[in-house]
Amino acid sequence: MTSPRVSFVVVTHARPRWLSGALESIRPQSIADREIVVVVNGPDPETQQLLRALGSEVRVTVLDRNCGVSGGRNAGIALARGEILLFLDDDAELRDRETAERVLTHFERDVDLGIVGFLVIDATTGAAERRVVPFRDKRLPHGVTEASYFPGGACAIRRRVFDSIGLYDASLFYAGEELDLSLRALDAGFRILFDPSVTVMHHGAEGVGASTAPYFYARNRPWVALRHLPLPCCVTHTLGWWAWSLARGVRAGAVASALCGIRDCVAGMPRIWRERRPVSRHTRRFLARNGGRLWY
């Protein structure tokens, strides 16, 4: 069987109503040479019933437990057959039926292009979600711009990236997995583009809750820094993200979550140290020039 050019990959966890909207936004895509892959991140009867009704239109894998964002995406990568994998969160929708065609044009023009990130629009306000704009200052560029990371729930990735550098780090579960992959991709010579004209509508359904997020940020962001960045940058990342997680924990009444994240971060640092592969000087210079997450 000939492999499709594009695989649309959606990871879902107990959100069938939102998943239905995501799939409906994929179906009108103008590209014919495509497939749709859905990863059910832990058994959910309602979601599975919805997918059964779609029949062979969707390729489905059901994981025996919730493996997190990174583990779920890895399962989707394993099932997908396309040359380009277009990832969409289950509570998001493509806004343009030409999205895949436009993204393919970028990859066809540049053999070293590994990842294209999209602009995420808040479905309630109609404004850009600045927190996932892949630049430190969060300002929107006027056109297609080279970037140092990308929004994982609204992006397209060339399969060769995964073949070359491996999959997402499943141990991260949630938070920091895109940055980890970005640093490895950049260091392997792949380029990342951010195209603000390719947009995704995000409904912001409840995922990892406000009481849980401080744990993952406190644990994961220092790990990613320790694995890839110079030691002075590791110090600023660690202190900065621990402070941020504690502040967020205070606002959410979840200080204990942040403290547990700090505890588990420290406990896991010996393992991360053994995995440490700092990026090259060339990559560090690129991060400094292009608004990358070098110091925080």
Regions found by a protein language model. Give the residues of each.
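N-proximal low-complexity "stem/linker" segments adjacent to membrane-targeting elements
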Residues: 1-25
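Acidic donor-binding segment of Leloir-type glycosyltransferases
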Residues: 23-62
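Glycine-rich, basic loop-to-helix element that forms the pyrophosphate-binding segment
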Residues: 63-80
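Short aromatic/hydrophobic "clamp" motif used to bind/position activated sugar donors
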Residues: 85
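Conserved donor NDP-sugar-binding/catalytic core segment of glycosyltransferases
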Residues: 97-129
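A recurrent flexible, glycine/aromatic-enriched loop bordering the glycosyltransferase active site
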Residues: 122, 139-157, 179-180, 209
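A short, conserved alpha-helix in the catalytic core of glycosyltransferases
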Residues: 149-157, 161-166, 171-199
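Non-catalytic, C-terminal membrane-associated alpha-helical segments of glycosyltransferases
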Residues: 233-296
